[in-house]
């Protein structure tokens, strides 16, 4: 089995993945959302301290799953990029300590690659090549995935990420953090879902394949300020619905542009923001239009987790992509290549 560790942002997670058949044997996670909610976003120093508390607790649960028989482990895998440096280092220190004390090889995993492999948790076979939309609090990307070692970024955000824009809109409406499920509920509760969009769809006439949410976010801010004296629940629902609809339509328009160029046969959607049901439905329709198979990460494995890191690290294990402890380090940025 491989013991995998995830600590790139505000989720502490450990998992055990069986090498022979890619089955997830154990998965434990502690979220920090309640600790960061009053700040309207993740506070790096607080997140680091909480990882230092939570990771050892999760390791104790792993020990129980193993019946304290560490001979079942064949490798230690850790997310080392991208993410918050102060949280990545907490996971890396644990991974190095385990690797050294148990005399096990160390695997360093890219967090974005891990999200791609969330599509294949509990599955030995993958369906590569495929294209993938990754939407989260930190990223909005289209990836072309040929195999484990050949993943390229073909589109990214020029400013805010999809998930980050939901957090900021929720904060404008004084509704808390994380904003994704809060704004999604506003949209679901809105009583007039078929009216024309009140906010502009970003980059609608741009020739570039990219994402941008700053202009949409600013349009929401102006609407909130205009309604500030009477910002009741109905107005918040209307703003939430129209913001979410414009944000998803932006993703659809840009992905449709990509589809027309590349015509992928298989398209995956991953990342924490891919839990949004309206987004999933919109992409189901898009993939039907282009006769493209849609694959979705299970809802429980959309947000950051060690299970996806364990699944991706199986590929590294088979290729013997191990890293000496003295060369193991972290990076706040991904080293995946971008198309020029």
From Swiss-Prot:
Protein name: tRNA N6-adenosine threonylcarbamoyltransferase
Coiled-coil segments on the chain, per record: none
Function: Required for the formation of a threonylcarbamoyl group on adenosine at position 37 (t(6)A37) in tRNAs that read codons beginning with adenine. Is involved in the transfer of the threonylcarbamoyl moiety of threonylcarbamoyl-AMP (TC-AMP) to the N6 group of A37, together with TsaE and TsaB. TsaD likely plays a direct catalytic role in this reaction.
A molecular function GO annotation: iron ion binding
Keywords (A to Z) from UniProt: Acyltransferase, Cytoplasm, Iron, Metal-binding, Transferase, tRNA processing
PROSITE patterns: GLYCOPROTEASE
Protein localization: Cytoplasm
